[in-house]
């Protein structure tokens, strides 16, 4: 929007000193926001005042000239007259107590020229800060919340009420700054469709040095001013504090005021010795419903600033200073205000030439507000007293020039990620993504740990299977060895049997002579297990028949037994018992012999080919078992290697998880802090 700077004039009431000195009011508020100067009071010379008891006669022209020529020294205390009814003289009237002074009256009225000025708003001494704020500042504060840059400035002579207008006097009569802050947070509370981020900064310009009132370190003093090709002039290193409530902002202002330079002068016991600029940076973005695209990250961000400026007042060095320090401060204040007046004058004249913004730190900092994209309101404070008539008149002239300046304010929107609000939103999204990754990693780690436990169980099972395979292998090897031994024994027995069957027996082998009766008698007497002592005795008493003539190799034991038995038919009982014992032993031996014969028969029937085939089969099974065992071993090795890799991966994941958890704790702490601040804000509003 293209509009002129809004200019208002506010007059303060007479102070105690002005009332005590009986100063006159030389300015009159009229209709249509017009202020007009009044003529000064008339002074009468002492020599022209006759005694009160002597009536004054009409004066001729000559006496008038003589009386006019006799003017010497005016009265030190001027006559007090009503503001709107100046003294009038009547040359034709006699016997009056007030002397007629046509010559001085004619001279004063001919020299006095009334001055009238019209502004946007006029505030008489009876107006309070609420009325000033509602009329001048409220609309600009709302514009700042809608994306326009705005500046509100208090300008005037010293002790004219600038600081009172901007800051007020406590909670009962707050100024423009606290009322603006209250309105900003009320607007945020009522605006549900947008989200806001507020930052504040507070600086002072003292003796042409820029100081940060919110900083306490040495690097916060004498800050440098730079210019950005897009954003314009800015103060490098100025601290910006994010705020969440009205109380938070007011506490920062209170802390900044404690660092501001103030001093006592002849005009004011607490006079501001520096210019201050309280800035609020407002970022807002439309709140989109959840699930609508990227959550509103692509919507533009409105960026605006609200500057609340309290200027130090101009003053006369001869009257205001009580020390060299105050004199120096006053000279810097007057210099900066003079430069501001020059800049305002050139801007009001639409001068396209050089504008001396750089001649003062004040005009340099205010360059964006005065000549750029900003809505500006200036509140000029004056005093109506006659002792400050010239200073008030100069202030009104400054206000008239400022009213001619036109600015083109527009809504500021940022589409990229330079806005701090969008950066915070992106950071929150990034932190949420990291948190999701951390949770996913934690879940993966849990799954890996579970898999590790399963692999341990599987490995133990494989180890048990491996041990069982080893045992089975040993068993198979033992069976093969036993079979090999049995084959060798069977072969030797077959060889011995073939030698005995050829009839070439000799008397040397007790085994062959013992086996022969069993073999020969087995055919005729059946199973040896059914032999009784009597039958065995009868067997031994039998004579060799013709069928067994070839079996002449009857053992000597049989012969001796036979002879003992024969002789025992008529012997005593002792010999009979001995014979029975021998027969019993022989029966046991025959049973053992039968078992041996059965084994020999089995081994004889078990030929070598089938044994070799069985051995090959067993060897095949053994090879298969070896292959299975090798497979188990390779699988176990693979699982051990995989388990080792998993252990390394688990260690790496645990290390990453610890880092992520540490980062997550930090993020969670920051998030908790932001949530607490947001909750405080929600509770407050």
From Swiss-Prot:
Pfam families in the record: Kinesin
Subcellular localization: Cytoplasm, Cytoskeleton
GO BP annotation list: microtubule-based movement
Coiled-coil stretches noted in the UniProt entry, renumbered to this chain: 411-488, 574-683
Classification via InterPro entries: Kinesin-like_fam, Kinesin_motor_CS, Kinesin_motor_dom, Kinesin_motor_dom_sf, P-loop_NTPase
Stretch list, region Disordered: 36-105, 495-568
Domain of life where this protein originates: Eukaryota
Domain Kinesin motor, first and last residues per copy: 4-405
CDD domains named in the record: KISc_CENP_E (cd01374)
Binding-site list for ATP: 156-163
One cellular component (GO) term of this entry: spindle microtubule
Compositionally skewed regions (Polar residues) per UniProt: 511-520
A molecular function GO annotation: microtubule binding
UniProt keyword list: ATP-binding, Coiled coil, Cytoplasm, Cytoskeleton, Microtubule, Motor protein, Nucleotide-binding, Transport
Biased composition annotated in UniProt, kind: Low complexity: 47-105, 533-565
Main location group: cytoplasm
Protein family (similarity comment): Belongs to the TRAFAC class myosin-kinesin ATPase superfamily. Kinesin family.
Function summary: Microtubule-associated force-producing protein that plays a role in organelle transport. Its motor activity is directed toward the microtubule's plus end.
Entry protein name: Kinesin-related protein 11
Organism: Dictyostelium discoideum
